[in-house]
Amino acid sequence: MIKLNEYETSLSERLLISLHNLCATSGEMARRSDDLAQIVQTDVNTVNQCMDKHVSDGYVVSYFDNEGNRRFYLTSRGIIRVCSLFS
């Protein structure tokens, strides 16, 4: 079983887990990239690069809000991916 702490999971996985823990599973609950960067303690560009891969894999949806902030939320496929980390 994977232990879910910062030393045993990749940044990519921590971002998915963070979205899940924040209940970011719809557009209304989407989280800004700068918020995620603060949570995982990295810079916004790194978050955006990781999240671009998750978008292409179908795990995450990305959009820009009215203020120009990039936001992300998990798709159903992303939720399944996060749950698979726990088994």
Enumerate the predicted regions with their spans.
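A short, conserved structural fragment
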Residues: V55-D65
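Short amphipathic alpha-helical interaction segments
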Residues: Q41-S56
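Short acidic, hydrophobic short linear motifs in intrinsically disordered regions
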Residues: T25-Q38
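Short, locally clustered residues in the helix-turn-helix/winged-helix DNA-binding domain
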Residues: I17-A24, F86
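Minor-groove-contacting beta-hairpin "wing" of winged helix-turn-helix DNA-binding domains
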Residues: E67-L74
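Short, amphipathic alpha-helical interaction segments positioned at domain boundaries
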Residues: S76-S87
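Short alpha-helical segments that sit at the start of domains
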Residues: M1-S18
